[in-house]
Amino acid sequence: MSATQAKFSFGNVVLVSKLVDGKFPDYGRVIPQNQPKKLKLDRIALLQALQRAAILTSDKFRGVRWVLGDGSLKISCNNTEQEEAQEELDVPYKGEALDIGFNVGYLVDVLNNLDVAEVECGLGDANSSALFTLPERSDFKYVVMPMRI
């Protein structure tokens, strides 16, 4: 064993691995800070709306558009066959409107794997990442990069 290796023992099994050279990236720099637009969203309602919209996204381009306005979040998508899906959720939001796109798969993945009633979403502008957090768990953060739609 050397300083460039890691050793793991599980009963009669021993695993030795070479450590990666270099410095671990500063992941804290990609977590958005001070996002002015805050939403509290019903996880199940949002998940179901996204799943319905995802049916009409193309396999290659999985984009959904969120249009946030006073009291509503409109979710829409379309595909190459000119089919379109639109959903609207009531949200407790008052403020500046926002039009932003996301890969629906990333949103569905996080919402599918949570066991909570409500999620919080922090948004900046159309080019800024979204930050999903949980009201009762300060250790949970999920960052979703926007995409152009």
Segments (PLM) and residue ranges:
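Short hinge/gating elements
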Residues: V30-N34
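DNA polymerase processivity clamps
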Residues: M1-V20, Q35-I149
